[in-house]
Swiss-Prot record:
HAMAP family: Ribosomal_bL9 (MF_00503). GO terms for biological process: translation. SUPFAM superfamilies: L9 N-domain-like, Ribosomal protein L9 C-domain. Keywords: Ribonucleoprotein, Ribosomal protein, RNA-binding, rRNA-binding. GO terms for cellular component: ribonucleoprotein complex; ribosome. It comes from Anaplasma marginale (strain St. Maries). NCBIfam families: L9. This is Large ribosomal subunit protein bL9. Pfam families: Ribosomal_L9_C, Ribosomal_L9_N. It comes from the Bacteria. Residues 167-220 are annotated as: Disordered.
Amino acid sequence: MLSVILKSSVRGLGKAGEIAKVRPGYARYLLADGKAVRATKDNVALLEQKLALIEEENSKKLAEAEGVAKSLGAERLIIVRQSSDDGKLFGSVTVRDVSKLLCDLGYDIQPRCVSFSEVIKRTGEYEINVELHADLVAALQLHVVRNESEAERVRLGIAKSEDQAAAAAEVEQAEDVAAAEQQDSSPVDDHADDADGATGGEGRDEGAGDASDGEEMPST
């Protein structure tokens, strides 16, 4: 096992600035990819000096990844593949296919960052995972269809669902505003109620007194 200092966070291994022990083959990959340096005495000393800078850089990369995740969530991921009438694909959809789709949409996502929970060998809707950062994995919906006509129907269906969700949100917001305005326009004044009750009580007492004064004493 070799000790390396991680220059950036690696999922399942550690965060930027940490020292990790890995097999020689994996160490060569990390070194070549610029994700780590050898944990020599000099590098460890240098790490201690630059640790704050490394953590700041990692936070910056995480913020960028969160922005990419939000943007990806708005994309409609559709792959067209030939299939039989029952939906069985002539082949399968691979992580490379998804990586190419994302790259075509303007995202630099390598195949190693894509994963599926199941092998995609039929048309349908699937959840895929895209690792954008060691601390952030985006779960996306992938639609696999047999032709462009079906792809267009999927696009229209997604758009309709989004419109319905937006309309429902607007209605809910309007109802909340109306309820708040109604509550503001009819305040409950507890002091006024107490005052009215006290006045009413005094009126009743005075009336009772007047009635008593007006009664005649029975003659004997």
